[in-house]
């Protein structure tokens, strides 16, 4: 497919900047949602890059996803005349959130109010959510179940779902009362 040089550069700039690209599998879509070029041109250029192993393709839920490979990074770097210190966003280290530190000496910070025994209770306030004693005795009480004279028995290979014997044309088992 013939793709104009301006559209080709736009797609390549976006792919190099982000390191990934996606497109909905809709060949009639007028414009790609993030790049100002027709969706079909994005798909066809990425198919070309895939055959040259510049990108790796994944398809899920009617969307194509392309991930830039090392060879693709080198190709786009020369194609777009970029210096070697410019890298795609997928290769940049993300800044760690400035939350609380995980480690450190045990006496660094307060652990909340102390309880009798010198330490926090193991499970906190969970007792407030637990149910109290039940009618049949302590926790648990009498269990309701089958009556004492109940005798479960296996009924054999009757007609039913699952791994039954035979199919539609199989004869009914004897004593089942079925024709």
UniProtKB/Swiss-Prot annotation:
<dbReference type="GO" id="GO:0003735">
    <property type="term" value="F:structural constituent of ribosome"/>
</dbReference>
<feature type="compositionally biased region" description="Basic and acidic residues">
    <location>
        <begin position="108"/>
        <end position="129"/>
    </location>
</feature>
<feature type="compositionally biased region" description="Low complexity">
    <location>
        <begin position="145"/>
        <end position="156"/>
    </location>
</feature>
<dbReference type="GO" id="GO:0022626">
    <property type="term" value="C:cytosolic ribosome"/>
</dbReference>
<dbReference type="GO" id="GO:0009505">
    <property type="term" value="C:plant-type cell wall"/>
</dbReference>
<dbReference type="GO" id="GO:0003729">
    <property type="term" value="F:mRNA binding"/>
</dbReference>
<dbReference type="InterPro" id="IPR005326">
    <property type="entry name" value="Plectin_eS10_N"/>
</dbReference>
<protein>
    <recommendedName>
        <fullName>Small ribosomal subunit protein eS10x</fullName>
    </recommendedName>
</protein>
<keyword id="KW-0963">Cytoplasm</keyword>
<dbReference type="GO" id="GO:0009536">
    <property type="term" value="C:plastid"/>
</dbReference>
<keyword id="KW-0687">Ribonucleoprotein</keyword>
<dbReference type="InterPro" id="IPR036388">
    <property type="entry name" value="WH-like_DNA-bd_sf"/>
</dbReference>
<keyword id="KW-0689">Ribosomal protein</keyword>
<feature type="compositionally biased region" description="Gly residues">
    <location>
        <begin position="157"/>
        <end position="167"/>
    </location>
</feature>
<feature type="compositionally biased region" description="Low complexity">
    <location>
        <begin position="168"/>
        <end position="179"/>
    </location>
</feature>
<dbReference type="InterPro" id="IPR037447">
    <property type="entry name" value="Ribosomal_eS10"/>
</dbReference>
<dbReference type="GO" id="GO:0022627">
    <property type="term" value="C:cytosolic small ribosomal subunit"/>
</dbReference>
<feature type="compositionally biased region" description="Gly residues">
    <location>
        <begin position="134"/>
        <end position="144"/>
    </location>
</feature>
<dbReference type="Pfam" id="PF03501">
    <property type="entry name" value="S10_plectin"/>
</dbReference>
<comment type="similarity">
    <text>Belongs to the eukaryotic ribosomal protein eS10 family.</text>
</comment>
<feature type="region of interest" description="Disordered">
    <location>
        <begin position="90"/>
        <end position="179"/>
    </location>
</feature>
């Amino acid at each position: 497919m013939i793709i104009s040089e301006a559209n080709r550069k736009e797609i390549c700039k976006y792919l190099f900047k982000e390191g990934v690209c996606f497109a909905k599998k809709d060949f009639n879509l007028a414009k790609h949602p993030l790049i100002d070029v027709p969706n079909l041109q994005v798909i066809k250029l990425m198919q070309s890059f895939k055959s040259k192993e510049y990108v790796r393709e994944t398809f899920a839920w009617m969307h194509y996803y392309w991930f830039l490979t090392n060879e693709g990074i080198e190709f786009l770097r020369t194609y777009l005349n970029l210096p070697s210190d410019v890298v795609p966003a997928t290769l940049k280290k993300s800044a760690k959130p400035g939350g609380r530190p995980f480690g450190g000496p045990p006496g660094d910070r307060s652990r909340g109010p102390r309880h009798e025994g010198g330490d926090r209770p193991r499970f906190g306030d969970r007792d407030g959510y637990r149910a109290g004693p039940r009618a049949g005795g302590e926790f648990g009480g009498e269990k309701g179940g089958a009556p004492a004279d109940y005798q479960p028995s296996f009924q054999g290979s009757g007609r039913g779902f699952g791994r039954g014997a035979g199919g539609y044309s199989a004869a009914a088992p004897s004593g089942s009362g079925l024709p």
